[in-house]
Amino acid sequence: MAAAAAHPIVNLNCFSFLIFVIIRILNSINITSAIPRGRWELLQQSIGISAMHMQLLNNDHVIVFNCTDFGPSSLSLPDGICRNDINDFFLQHHCTSHSAEYDVFNNSIRPLMLQTDTWCSSGAVSPDGTLIQTGGFSDVGRTARIFQPCATCDWQEFPIELSAPRWYPTNQILPDGRVIVIGGQENNYEFYPKSLSISSTITSLFPITLLEQNSNLYPFVHLNVDGNLFIFAYNQAILFEHTTYSVVTTFPAILDYQPRTYPFTGSSVLLPLRNLLQQSVEAEVLICGGAPWGSYQDATSGNFTQALNTCGRIRITDPNATWTMETMPLPRVMGDMTLLPNGQVLIINDAVRGLAGWGDPVFYLVLHRPGNKNGSRFQVQNPTTIPRLY
């Protein structure tokens, strides 16, 4: 049974951890065939924690972390270290880890110490490879966390770094190396570290009207080739100039007008840039899945609507940009999309119905090949056996 989440969550893996290996598809294989492809390899039966958030770093290690207050994990902290937080609702004292470092090459796990609750936080990786994670649940919404890759490094946590509490925000790295933190129960944004040009007498919070009118929870944000930000919320998008705090372009609504951001929870990627040698580089955004309008009200009454099976694609560098729509092989809500080294897009996880979780999982992966013609871009891969959704 699918259901609306009792507590909303980021759309990432939330059950036992599985690193997958997709075997390269040979050119001789007929790509129009409906036969699923790829092979799964189980590397760890469990790493001891749930993978709510995951980030691959530049040393080929994956940082995995989860909320800290829903119960002890199966991974103990080292050297008698324990976590104490009198403000937690369920778990004020325990000695288990809610974060781990996975070494891809050695297939090994190292427990990490998280004091603050990263539930529904957001992050980005800086140019030097440092993971910057901001926001979180309850009293830690203004927290910033730093993880620098090294053999013995652990989380560094700074409780009052943000100007406003952030829960369900989105982070995006900027050309100057700073991170912009957008939304998250707020219809505004701020920078981390804060801009040196901002006077202490001037607020460092800047409103975005789009987020007032739509959802400000986990908006989709991508850095355009001109330095402006593509921001998508609910079913609409803008191109935003973050240095002048102005809207450069208002894009048309996605053609089916269906909502895609949390809690309707589709997924989005900036497609690989393909014409880097030309004078004007083109940039395209792909948004897939989600839940139809009205599904939130339906879920509260026990009716779990089928997820969307459509994708929208838009070339955000065009002066008169328009959406084109595609149909996926399967409906998906609360999935993940990631770019592969060959320029293809992997669509993974999800539920078939409901919103923001959590039953009726989609086991089949899908490859999206953006260079193919519309109608021949999707290729179903062999299924996993493990549900991965909230």
For each predicted feature, which ranges?
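Beta-propeller domains
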Residues: I29-L43, Q55-L114, T134-A151, E212-G354
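Beta-propeller and closely related beta-sheet repeat lectin domains
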Residues: S50-M54, D60, S97, W119-A124, ...
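Short loop/turn segments immediately following the C-termini of beta-strands
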Residues: N59, C67-D69, D128, G136-D139, ...
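Asp-box/WD-like beta-propeller blade repeats and closely related beta-sheet repeat scaffolds
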Residues: G141-P219
